[in-house]
Amino acid sequence: MKRVFSLLEKSWLGAPIQFAWQKSSGNYLAVTGADYIVKIFDRHGQKRSEISLPGNCVTMDWDKDGDILAVIAEKSSCIYLWDANTNKTSQLDNGMRDQMSFLLWSKIGSFLAVGTIKGNLLIYNHQTSRKIPVLGKHTKKITCGCWNSENLLALGGEDKMITVSNQEGDTIRQTPVKSEPSDIKFSMSKTDERISSAENTISAVVGKKMLFLFHLNEPDNPVDLEFQQAYGNIVCYSWYGDGYIMIGFSRGTFLAISTHFPEVGQEIFKARDHKDNLTSVALSQTLNKAATCGDNCIKIHDLTELRDMYAIINLDDENKGLGTLSWTDDGQLLALSTQRGSLHVFLTKLPILGDACHTRIAYLTSLLEVTVANLIEGEPPITVSVDVEPTFVAVGLYHLAVGMNNRAWFYVLGENVVKKLKDVEYLGTVASICLHSDYAAALFEGKIQLHLIENEMLDAQEERETRLFPAVDDKCRILCHALTSDFLIYGTDTGIIHYFFIEDWQFVNDYRHPVGVKKLFPDPNGTRLVFIDEKSDGFVYCPVNDATYEIPDFSPTIKGVLWENWPMDKGVFIAYDDDKVYTYAFHKDTIQGSKVILAGSTKLPFSHKPLLLYNGELTCQTQSGKINSIYLSTHSFLGSMKDTEPTDLRQMLTQTLLLKRFSDAWDICKMLNDRTSWSELAKACLHHMEVEFAIRVSRTMGDVGTVMSLEQIKGIEDYNLLAGHLAMFTNDFNLAQDLYLASNCPVAALEMRRDLQHWDSALQLAKRLAPDQIPFISKEYAIQLEFTGDYVNALAHYEKGITGDNKEHDEVCLAGVAQMSIRMGDIRRGANQALKHPSRVLKRDCGAILENMKQFSEAAQLYEKGQYYDRAASVYIRCKNWAKVGELLPHVSSPKIHLQYAKAKEADGRYKEAVVAYENAKQWNSVIRIYLDHLNNPEKAVSIVRETQSLDGAKMVARFFLQLGDYGSAIQFLVLSKCNNEAFTLAQQHNKMEIYADIIGAEDTTNEDYQSIALYFEGEKRHFQAGKFFLLCGQYSRALKHFLKCPSSEDNVAIEMAIETVGQAKDELLTNQLIDHLMGESDGMPKDAKYLFRLYMALKQYREAARTAIIIAREEQSAGNYRNAHDVLFSMYAELKAQKIKIPSEMATNLMILHSYILVKIHVKSGDHMKGARMLIRVANNISKFPSHIVPILTSTVIECHRAGLKNSAFSFAAMLMRPEYRNKIDAKYKKKIEAMVRRPDTSETEEATTPCPFCQFLLPECELLCPGCKNNIPYCIATGRHMLKDDWTMCPHCGFPALYSEFKILLNSESTCPMCSERLNSSQLKKITDCSQYLRTEME
């Protein structure tokens, strides 16, 4: 809010002053103080006149048009009238001797009401000079009053009475009030649901505390509104809106109340605007603003939303308090008086005047100030003081023009200075002016004057200095105009847009529109313009091709248009009205031709006028004389997109595509990174014929097909042909056809329609473009018609398609003719055509058509001719032509046809033929039935049942054997047919339960069946069979009971079954029962320990099984069964390892010694005496574990050591044999030799080779298994018995025991099994293990 001026005259100081704005125009301000003078100032603070009075001014008022100011003064009976038009003062005698106290002009007409201190009234008609004195209107001083729009006058006086009079002075209403009234006003109040435009409600402040409401039509129901005492006195109030009242209270409260029924007096807004006091409230309906003053400040509220504070003006220098506020009618100026006698005038609303030239703008910043700025290019703003308050502003490249009425002042724009050039007077009131670099064009009264701005600038011919448009003989009226760098363009009421080329000084173009052109807006280059016609429709006009394009969704309220000044967005423009900005884009090159699209709209803030559009930023001028930039919602993508949601990004993508901003769209697509967005961008590129960019997008998408297609067409120069291809790519085929036909390659339209299979269109095009293609198109069209069921037209097109010189094509057409002839009922023609045709498929298809038409004979003939024997036989069957069926049967593969034929032959009693046919049809039940019932061949029937597992067939065979009395076979086939109950009953009746039990035990049978058999055997006291079937049905207790009752002849098998039973039952009671039995607790006869071992294994009690296994092995070893002992220990070792249970060291040691013994035989047999000797030494060192073979083992040890050269070892064991307990048991064959060794000892011995420990690399003898270095037990090789080596490691793939890779391979050359697990093995199955660390880790654990 800018202060325009302040008035502070010495004569006013110390006392409050009165002032009054001129109504309507607000050009004058009348002010008076205590100096007996009314001074009249203009709106810029310059004194224009004054009225001298005989005493202090009582009151003053302007008439409704602002032409006459009426003033009354103390000590005078005259009314002073100042004429604003003539600047003259006249006096009017009131004709009454009373001192005047009140004066007011009417709202309608020129009536002046004057009241006196004695209550008399004078109504003066200024137009007719008629005076109407009314005596005694009030009994005391008239203090206030108000006119309404129907010329009713309401008056209030000190007599506590309100009267309502007409313009003749007649009283039509009067009402008493409780206290002295003040501030009377008329308004339209809504006290009920009636809507009336008449001002029929009177309001007044009564006693400064109460608001009185009085309805003229309901005089008996006045309303008194009282307020809180804390608010203080009512200072002033105003009606606003739809029946609302705004009230200011002396203690600073600002209130809004409603007068709507039934909420009369309800507070709808309250604010403590001022802390200490409030002195005035003023309302501007034009601005929709309310102002309050107090506490040295003015606060301005927006009436739309009272909570919004529009502005605050502080007056720190006013320390005596503020006075009265008042707006001009147009809301431009707000005046404030103060208690010390000063007056301040503020600019609250400027006329929104501005102009732009490229990126330079000029706009009004004060009543007498224009600012020129170029924010885009960073030029500092220049302020220009002007001589008059302008009504138009124009800016050019080098000049500024301002003016009013018929005069314009021109200024030259320098770098940082503005120089006044000249002023020009035109022949009429100027509506608008436009500037060129050299010329100005002023529009006034339907004419344009084009003239040089600076005459000395150009050495122009005289006729080029100025020119008036239109010519004298042209009767049109110019409504709008514009100047570009080259042209003067103007539009007329007859609808013609003229282009005047300034350089050649002549017209170069005109366009005729059906109705008048009222506004036009060229783009910065002048190559396009938007114009608005008298119907308020908008169009884009291109003078280059003289074409116009209607602007879609063009609002009739549009005030103006701005083109985008950003050089990269040439086709974008906005149209604006008071509320919205609509963004449009003119797309010159699209596959649909040039067109205008609406890109979106943006809300325009209140009282903003757009001046300049640059890259989506709209610079607007405001009422306050400032500029404000808003960003179009259609250009939201220009902001930061860092944390934008995908939904918003997709919306931005749509905006960029509408505005053809493909680079921005590319960036958004990269952020979205989804195929849909890239596809939208690619489609838009095709639409705008941006082929290179479309290729780039398609390549990014990986759309190889599109890239290849676009690469092929990108070099096409024919616009229509290229557009046609692109339209086709976007599936707009009708448009593509039109474009192709308009191009220099119209046959492309035919090719497209053929590719799309639009045969009807293709035929029409072929007649004109390629008649030789008609037969080929006819054939394709016929195929499509046939598919849709239009056989008549299909036949016609097939016939048209026959060329006579293209065999393959003609065959297709003839096939079509054959099929369509049959479908049309011409069977003979169609069938003959099909029979003559070489195609098998045609014969099949025609046969199918004939079969559907119930023409079986012809159908079968065609099928047979086409070698479709199954179909032919099927149709012959429908004809009952069995002879033909028989002929075709060897060629028929369909079981269904064989079945039909078989049934027919069976009915005829020809069973051998029938059975063959049934076999071909895979109908095994029927085959079995015929073999049993008719051909008496049960062997064949049984064979088929066993082969096919047919349940029904098995039943039939069972019945057959039952009739023969062969119950065993009958039971077998009953079980096979799942008839277990019948089989059981039959077995029971004929004492064949063993057979039934054997059969049922091999089948997947239910527990009930097993239980039935078990119960039967239980009754028969056949314990083993009873136990077996109780086990199968899960009754473990009963099964165990029967197994333990078995006689001794079945003892071994029964105990095995008992162990299996307990293993499955996992019942501790049953386990203990069986253990007692095995230990001999029940019968005093302990059973073999192997059964206990098997029991523990079945129960998965591996530790107990291991202890038992050691005992068994020991017994076997003692008995000399070393292989058995080895196998028992090995199996237990493997089971414990599988269960990840630690191997007992005793078991591992025993297994190692037994295995060493087994290796002796292998190595001795192969002649490797050293390996045999080493293993025998290990065995002999543990000879106590071989008690039954001590002497033979020691003898073998002596012999093998001797053979291997281990003389000292041979001597040691020979000496052992010489002990008395062994000496006599030595085999006579070796006795002398051994005695000789002892008598003549040879202690020489080959030293045993040393190899590294796999754990610590300590060198120790190769047969030593305990490392002295790391104290670890080293794994031994199952092929040699030596300790393992890290770099020569393998293992048996079956048992997982380690072996030396090189030695195991040598062993397997002579042996075919693993020496440990006895599984078959060959050397190719061995794999050398390079990293044996995991095996060593297992050994350590």
Swiss-Prot record:
Which is an annotated Pfam family here? Zf_IFT144_1st
- Residue stretches of each TPR repeat: 736-769, 775-808, 840-873, 895-928, 951-984, 1020-1053
Ranked from the top, the taxonomy reads:
Eukaryota, Metazoa, Chordata, Craniata, Vertebrata
Q: Which InterPro entries does UniProt cross-reference here?
A: TPR-like_helical_dom_sf, TPR_IF140/IFT172/WDR19, WD40/YVTN_repeat-like_dom_sf, WD40_rpt, WDR19/dyf-2, WDR19_WD40_rpt, Znf_IFT121-like
In the record for this protein, the WD repeats are positioned at 11-51, 52-92, 95-134, 137-175, 273-311, 317-356
Which named protein is this? WD repeat-containing protein 19
Q: Where in the cell is it found?
A: Cell projection, Cilium; Cytoplasm, Cytoskeleton, Cilium basal body; Cell projection, Cilium, Photoreceptor outer segment; Cell projection, Cilium, Flagellum
Subunit composition and interactions: Component of the IFT complex A (IFT-A) complex. IFT-A complex is divided into a core subcomplex composed of IFT122:IFT140:WDR19 which is associated with TULP3 and a peripheral subcomplex composed of IFT43:WDR35:TTC21B. Interacts (via C-terminal region) with IFT122 (via C-terminal region). Interacts with BBS1. Interacts with TTC25.
Question: Which keywords has UniProt assigned to this entry?
Answer: Cell projection, Cilium, Cilium biogenesis/degradation, Cytoplasm, Cytoskeleton, Flagellum, Repeat, TPR repeat, WD repeat
GO cellular component terms, alphabetically, are: cilium; cytoplasm; cytoskeleton; intraciliary transport particle A; motile cilium; non-motile cilium; photoreceptor connecting cilium; photoreceptor outer segment
Q: Which GO terms describe its biological process?
A: cell morphogenesis; cilium assembly; digestive system development; ear morphogenesis; embryonic camera-type eye development; embryonic cranial skeleton morphogenesis; embryonic limb morphogenesis; gonad development
Job description of the protein = As component of the IFT complex A (IFT-A), a complex required for retrograde ciliary transport and entry into cilia of G protein-coupled receptors (GPCRs), it is involved in cilia function and/or assembly. Essential for functional IFT-A assembly and ciliary entry of GPCRs. Associates with the BBSome complex to mediate ciliary transport.
Organism source for this protein?
Mus musculus
Q: Which gene encodes it?
A: Wdr19
Tissue distribution: Tissue-specific expression of isoforms. Expressed in the prostate, testis, epididymis, submaxillary and salivary glands. Expressed in ependymal cells lining brain ventricles (at protein level).
